[in-house]
Amino acid sequence: MQESTGYDVFVQEFGDEMMFEVDVFWIKAANLDPVSLIKGLSGRISQLHLKDIKKGINLPIYGGLPKDAFKELGNGMIPMEPIIEAAKAAGVAHCHVEQDQSPDPIASIKESMVYLKGL
């Protein structure tokens, strides 16, 4: 018998009016597939946080992260194009570009936006 997680309880026990705010970085940090999760919550995601994670980090991550774990979109291991496609298909209204740690936040957001516009 497989035990349920807190996430499973939210998805199964709350009605469809319960919306989720999903962060693709932390989904990937748990070694899960963001696209599958987005598809599984189709119609129930109000906001999607787009972040990228440094290539070469062993997943899943337990405990602390190095400050350089957060990368500009397109510079890490998370393929954003299928995530954006899944988000559109799932009816996600708002996507937010984030980078928790950056030596130059303005340059980082600019680089991430250039990447997104190129998709």
Give the location of each predicted region.
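A short, acidic, flexible beta-alpha connecting loop/helix-capping segment that sits on the rim
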Residues: 96-105
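Short helix-capping segments at alpha-helix termini
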Residues: 13-18, 89-91, 119
